[in-house]
Amino acid sequence: MLFRSVAGCDTPYTIPLPGRHHVQDALAAVAVCRQLGLPEEAIRQGLEGAAVPGRAQVFPNHRGIRVVVDYAHNAASFRAILSCLHCYPHGNIIVVFGAGGNRPPMRRLDMAQVAAELADCAIVTTDNPRWEPVEDICRSITQALGRQIPWEVIYDRREAIFRALDLAQPGDMVALLGKGHEGYIETCGLRLPFSEWTVLEEYFHRQP
């Protein structure tokens, strides 16, 4: 995304992240760097290389589906990333998400409401259930979704991702929200290895 700061400098900056919320973060970084006396060219080059794993990270594929992996795990970050996706030409937006266990229950309800508002279909699945039954977490989410959009519950996150990709048509978007850069699922005191990027590689490797 290309943007310009004001404050007496007309230098154009580019960041490898979509969305106005990332521009806001970048502007804050520019302000701090200027206060520290860094040259504008160094700031510009730094921002150009500021890709963050698991933050609006697009998985390239040959099927014409825009697949985005993002760490969004509350209503505000859900709204930010899904609103960002609406800025691009797209068909349906399919969102795959769950909610962390042993966290304020209202958080998962708020995320569900944002998903219902900004997505066309939801696959509800496991996030980090910790010590809370994943069935209870998913039930809370689907109750909040109600009949606002079509949804399915698939507890196995790998299978949930596969299902979303099977449903997607060229031009659609699939947003995998909640895990981002994390390489595990936390449940019952254990951190079980899990990488959404690896799951995506597995899926598309199987595709003709």
Regions found by a protein language model. Give the residues of each.
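Short, small-residue-biased leader/transition segments that mark boundaries at the very start
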Residues: 1-2
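Glycine-centered tight beta-turn/hairpin loop motif at sheet-sheet or coil-to-beta transitions
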Residues: 6-10, 64
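A short glycine-threonine-serine/GTX helix/turn-capping micro-motif
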Residues: 12-20
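C-terminal accessory "lid"/substrate-recognition subdomains
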Residues: 21-22, 57
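ATP-dependent carboxylate-amine ligase
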Residues: 28-208
